[in-house]
């Protein structure tokens, strides 16, 4: 338990209907008793039952600062497992600062970013994966990201990681016991048994690792790149999807020379839409850089939208783009369907097996079909998303990859016929690495770094 008491404004520092000042620590009740007075002047918060709310006033010595409601949560039944008070006041910036200053003057110190959640972790109320999911809940950009983050906040990752760790620890204990007491505990045929157990854990860890791309998409959105030749209608399409003029649209080929990126929400699905330079052979140095970037973004995209000007004949640039997209998740748009067609669906289908939609960006024809196609691809898992109960972040992914290597080394050790004491070394390495994910064996510097990313008052 921490010995000092912290305080912070937990709501946004802008005028609003209500502001909240949060206090947590061993002196919380003494501080609130000094600055709070009930309407009749008789009630002391410290004497009240936990999880109750009280109307009254905050005083700075003999001066009324604000009319408030005070929510009391006594240890250990609070967010931090410490005595905690939340002061609900009027949401003016000045009044919130004034109350915070009064709290600090009476014995608290300003909280660091994320320190309330850090105390919840250090006091054992949540593990490190749950703490990280708090950030994801706050930053969720759609219903799917929120659902995933809330599942993780409930401890879904913790349950799976703990189960794997317990099974590994059981084998470590068995090996050590057998080595200490070989007369009573036999290791005959044990390598074959352990091989199956470790192989199963490799499978389990690998399954958790597979959720990483899902997590990135849910947190950050689907990286969607628009490619095509100059003047195919890429910028017009971006403007339609965004709902306003973001890209310059002209008849001059090569107007877009760099990547324009906008984020849109398509019925709860977040898309990071990038309009790229038109792909063609060019002697212009600046435009060539833009073309190279367009190809690179397309290679790394979750989804590519390839816009073809259907009113002009296909050329080498079109075939180059289609070759680039053979193994990518892509939608092909035959734009300018309001004009005489020189490129048909049948012609494209002979070159590449992708969803093809005829549209007119100018007349806004086919846009709804495009949006529905993107939604269908998302829900059917064609852009790596599926309805997993949780997703992992980069830190957790790294530890899982290291764990996987340790387990694979154990398998190799068994196959090489090494002595049994070598097995427990690799298993212990895997056990400790999994502990880093949930915070049971993690360095203080890493904990500090994780919680420094939180907002103030959380």
List each language-model region with its residue ranges.
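Short glycine-/polar-rich loops that comprise or flank the Walker A/P-loop
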Residues: 16-18, 51-53, 300-304, 327-330, ...
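A glycine-rich (often HGG/GG-containing) alpha/beta subdomain
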Residues: 1-147, 151, 155, 331
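Conserved beta-strand segments of alpha/beta enzyme cores
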Residues: 109, 270-272, 355
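Glycine-rich, N-terminal phosphate-binding loop of Rossmann-like dinucleotide-binding domains
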Residues: 91, 241, 276, 308-311, ...
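Generic enzyme active-site microenvironment
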Residues: 273, 307, 333
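Switch I (G2) and immediately adjacent beta-strands of P-loop GTPase domains
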Residues: 54-66, 70-74, 254-282, 300-303
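Inter-motif core of Ras-like GTPase G domains
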Residues: 287-311
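C-terminal-of-GTPase-core extension/linker across diverse P-loop GTPases
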Residues: 2-9, 13, 143-265, 282-284, ...
